[in-house]
Swiss-Prot record:
Upper classification of the organism: Bacteria, Bacillati, Bacillota, Bacilli, Lactobacillales
GO biological process: 2-deoxyribose 1-phosphate catabolic process; 5-phosphoribose 1-diphosphate biosynthetic process; metabolic compound salvage; nucleotide metabolic process
Name of the gene this protein is made from: deoB
Top-level enzyme category: isomerase
Metabolic or biological pathway, per its Swiss-Prot or TrEMBL entry: Carbohydrate degradation; 2-deoxy-D-ribose 1-phosphate degradation; D-glyceraldehyde 3-phosphate and acetaldehyde from 2-deoxy-alpha-D-ribose 1-phosphate: step 1/2
Protein's name according to its UniProt entry: Phosphopentomutase
Role, per record: Isomerase that catalyzes the conversion of deoxy-ribose 1-phosphate (dRib-1-P) and ribose 1-phosphate (Rib-1-P) to deoxy-ribose 5-phosphate (dRib-5-P) and ribose 5-phosphate (Rib-5-P), respectively.
Keyword set includes Cytoplasm: yes
Organism the protein comes from: Streptococcus pyogenes serotype M4 (strain MGAS10750)
Family named by the database record: Belongs to the phosphopentomutase family.
Amino acid sequence: MSKFNRIHLVVLDSVGIGAAPDADKFFNAGVADTDSDTLGHISETAGLSVPNMAKIGLGNISRPIPLKTIPTEDNPTGYVTKLEEVSLGKDTMTGHWEIMGLNITEPFDTFWNGFPEEILTKIEEFSGRKIIREANKPYSGTAVIDDFGPRQMETGELIVYTSADPVLQIAAHEDIIPVEELYKICEYARSITLERPALLGRIIARPYVGEPGNFTRTANRHDYAVSPFQDTVLNKLADAGVPTYAVGKINDIFNGSGITNDMGHNKSNSHGIDTLIKTLQLPEFTKGFSFTNLVDFDANFGHRRDPEGYRDCLHEFDNRLPEIIANMKEDDLLLITADHGNDPTYAGTDHTREYIPLLAYSASFTGNGLIPQGHFADISATVAENFGVDTAMIGESFLGHLK
């Protein structure tokens, strides 16, 4: 019998809690990640008030220097710890795959200086369209169409760009490059990015419409991902008949593998929280696992090195945390964590190699305190033990520590 009938895992994308022991092997603009500390530096430089997460015990997590504006709780309502990554990457897919029990020994490739000519030339030859070279770099998806959409409307060239994650994105105006043509080009791009020197997690078709100065991306986005190389705990759950619900980009990250119910993409963190709450309220969701990703922290504020915006985004989540809890049942378990860091005060614009926080809350708890410090995959091992399925490659359950 399950200790908790439902477990809800919420990933606050990029909300790290201090440099990992191997941060010296990861870099931002030539600077090692050794001094990165997403939550610590936001607290220090922008001020951070998250009373609801603090109540669970966020300020009690062991750190060399306590979080400046987040107090410790003498009698927290939950259990907390921090977790270390073992995989050789600090991107979204690597973090999420490890959380679900995999050890990624060959990281995906990211392209901070844009894709090599070899890749661009192949796409040009296949599509019969030129690629706008100036867009070939990490770019905001809305900014890139604002900057190059007018040119695409004139020339029919492709807008190919990337991000901090191992993705290749192609934006195309639906009146200039029909959606079906864009999809075929993306399918081809997927076929040539399955191994080094360009091992990519996702190819994303990004159609848009409108006129210069007023472009909008449409719902015809399509992701061409790769499935995890081995079964994750999501697969173990699904195979055992335990329902799994994906909110936000979780379905894309796992290429649908092990997901029995995709609740759709998020338009924003707030929309994602709305979707999570609707998921919690589903009458048929009496037992199972929900997995939510809230990406605004990372996409809107981490990469843009905006500590004040990041702070406000954390405030927004914390303000809505009581709503999430109010829609949980007595025997539900809530786990709040991250997938990597992205210190908005740090050098460069890339993710940072950090520990991730873990907050555990249930109305059924009679105890509180610290969970032993472990690794990302301990989350999936705990979920697996709770529902009576096998773990994946790695992970040690902390279920027995939750009283």
